[in-house]
Regions:
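C-lobe/activation-segment region of protein kinase-like
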Residues: 136-222
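Regulatory N- and C-terminal appendages and interdomain linkers associated
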Residues: 1-12, 45-51, 205-222
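Conserved kinase catalytic-core helix
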Residues: 94-135, 139-140
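ATP-binding glycine-rich loop module of kinase domains
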Residues: 2-4, 14-73, 96-97
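Catalytic phosphate/metal-binding cores of nucleic-acid and nucleotide-processing enzymes, i.e., regions
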Residues: 3, 9-11, 17-20, 24-28, ...
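Protein kinase-like catalytic core scaffold
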Residues: 36, 83, 140-143
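Conserved hydrophobic "DFG−1" position in protein kinase catalytic cores
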Residues: 32, 87, 134-135
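Conserved structural core of kinase catalytic domains
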Residues: 64-108
Length: 222
């Protein structure tokens, strides 16, 4: 495979690609290249995928935990086929359940800062999923969901919309790791408004710095 990562030309044989291979989904294959991960779209993709214009816009935005495109990837003919992102070593995401809940809340605050940065650049986060969460003692969102640039909306409204999406993600995905029953989920819904300030509401309920995420959620669903 012959590709350009930004201005750098790579001629990768099958053996090298096998060595670099990390994972794949319905729309793309992921390879590790140095400190970066290369997301290369499959030829036939039936899902919506990030277009070149949006990827280029995102590559100019600086975030801490939401991993955005760095360089555009093209084939020999100059066609857009993907992009590079920072590579993150990860542990199983369920490990977050064993950490002190205040650590999770601190991580959420950092992600909220990234959401503010994206919102200030008119970037709307359309979807978040647990498969996009990377955990290595810190929480990262690896290429989360889909993005839309909505310059016709005010950045404040985009921020509120993005935080609502983030709040739903915390409820439906992070808490899902505990395999909560339907009744327990209803209890959580009564306790929290999963809108734009989920982290602050959760922080008010923390008993001490040593309480783990698992203990906290179980306590809140009694």
């Amino acid at each position: 495979m012959k590709i350009y990562v930004g201005e750098e030309f790579l001629d990768l044989d099958e053996e090298t690609l096998d060595y670099m291979y990390i994972d794949e989904g319905n729309e793309s294959e992921i390879y590790r290249y140095g400190k970066d991960a290369l997301k290369i779209y499959k030829r036939f993709c039936h899902k919506d995928r990030l277009d070149e214009e949006t990827a280029t816009i995102l590559s100019g935005i600086s975030t801490k935990r939401i991993l955005l495109p760095k360089e555009i990837i093209r084939d020999e003919s100059g066609n857009f086929i993907g992009y590079s992102m920072p590579f993150i070593y990860t542990y199983p995401v369920v490990g977050v359940l064993k950490r002190p809940v205040v650590e999770l809340l601190d991580e959420m605050d950092v992600i909220k800062e990234d959401i503010r940065v994206l919102s200030d650049n008119y970037v709307d986060i359309e979807d978040l999923h647990i498969r996009n969460v990377l955990y290595n003692g810190k929480l990262f969102m690896g290429d989360p969901g889909s993005y839309l640039v909505k310059r016709y909306k005010k950045s404040g409204q985009i921020y509120n919309d993005n935080m609502y999406t983030f709040g739903l993600f915390v409820r439906d995905e992070i808490f899902k790791l505990l395999k909560l029953t339907a009744g327990e989920r209803i209890d959580l819904n009564h306790k929290f408004d999963y809108s734009w300030d989920i982290g602050s509401q959760l922080r008010d309920e923390v008993i001490n710095d040593k309480e783990t995420v698992r203990q906290f959620i179980k306590r809140m669903t009694r």
